[in-house]
Amino acid sequence: CGKKNEDKSLSDLAYYRQFPYVNQELAYLYQAADFVISLAGANVIYEILALKKPNILIPLPKKASRGDQILNAESFSSQGFSVVLPQEELEENPAVLPDCLEKLHENKEKYIKAMEASRERDGRRNVLAVIQSVLDGKS
């Protein structure tokens, strides 16, 4: 939530915790999570993919970014990795979030299987392919 941004009205909710900042604890939080709701920055989406966590991506809107998060979210959605909820849609109708969570839950195995099958998860193969293409270009 950021430093000094904790919402005191949410402090007593079961199964919900606010952190001003997460550093070394992130691995434990991912491990404990059944699903992830996140922005769609490059680092976090690839963490989600590596961990095969069912997820809802809420990309920053174009007016608040370069549009890269929208492209990231669209890419992950088209590959079957993520449910995407545009921030504008969430702000206009917050009741859409439970619907997205239900969709995620109902299709959890489908999202996990898509992430397991992703070629993007095999860094070794991807690096070898780049090296081979460079070698082939020099031959």
Task: Map each language-model feature to its residues.
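Donor-nucleotide binding loops and adjacent catalytic segments primarily
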Residues: 1-36, 70-72, 85-94
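Conserved sugar-transfer catalytic core signal across GT-A, GT-B, and GT-C glycosyltransferases
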Residues: 25, 43-47, 51, 72
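Short alpha-helix at the nucleotide-sugar/activated-sugar donor binding site of glycosyltransferases
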Residues: 30, 48-49, 56, 77
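Acidic donor-binding loop of glycosyltransferase active sites
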Residues: 31-46, 53
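Short hydrophobic beta-strand element within catalytic cores of glycosyltransferases
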Residues: 38, 54-66
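C-terminal alpha-helical cap of glycosyltransferases
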Residues: 103-105, 120-139
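A short, well-ordered alpha-helix in the C-terminal region of glycosyltransferases
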Residues: 107-121
